[in-house]
Amino acid sequence: MRDPGLNEAIRAVGGVSELARKLGISQPSISNWNRVPAERVISVESLTGVSRAVLRPDLYREEKAGGDVDEIDSARAQEYALLGALLARAPSADLLKRLSGLRGDPTPLGLAHVALAQAASATTAEQVEREFFDLFIGIGRGELMPYGSYYLTGFLHERPLARLREDLGQLGIERTEGNAEPEDQAATLCEIMAGLAGGRLGAAAGSDQKIFERHVAPWLGRFFADLENAQGARFYQPVGTIGRLLMDIEAEAFALGA
């Protein structure tokens, strides 16, 4: 029996098949869900507009006044969630409209947000869908290969992926049934980091640093730099900038806390 949050998401997009299409997974996989998997909450929220607090109230409760919410970790989680959503699939027209309203401060990261807003305003969903295909899928392969194993070994499904699966298993984070992408895919790693940074996956304190240092820092910054400079990147150029800057900020922050 589906929980209310999953039912609301299905209604919001017009049915199970449409939600499966938007997520890029098989319809039977979603039909087997009782609730939205933890690692899919951010993506489903982005695609449907249904709040994460509705999708998974057990993970995303409304904070009470006087709570000990860490604003920095919340901001980190939001940045990772944004990157995860944009790397998982091309943004819809509705998401582009919301992105066009982004604002930023005079910091490099803030200016990258402004650049993303401008890029979102200057394109269409159809154009970005083609750009996404050319960059990450392609005929045979895309311009970029957004996988940790590929960046670290030159091949897919190598030892870096196995080590990541071991560490995720220790944290109780399991691969979603029907998801064809390996866990070392850039979007999946960003979604996992969003959940860890926001304390939403039930992992022990410091788990975000462990995953970052072992599985994110060795390659994801290089991927974002490549995306920033990719020949086919127009909308995705500022996405690469945001990712590269976030990787630098994270590495520096974890080093200071060591």
Model-predicted segments: where are they?
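Short, charged recognition helix plus adjacent turn
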Residues: 1-9, 17, 21, 39-46, ...
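Short amphipathic helical patch at the helix-1/turn junction of helix-turn-helix
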Residues: 10-11, 35
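Recognition helix of helix-turn-helix/homeodomain-like DNA-binding domains
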Residues: 22-37
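Short, charged early-sequence alpha-helical segments and their helix-coil boundaries
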Residues: 45-59, 112-123
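Surface/interface-facing alpha-helical segments and adjacent flexible terminal/loop regions used
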Residues: 67-258
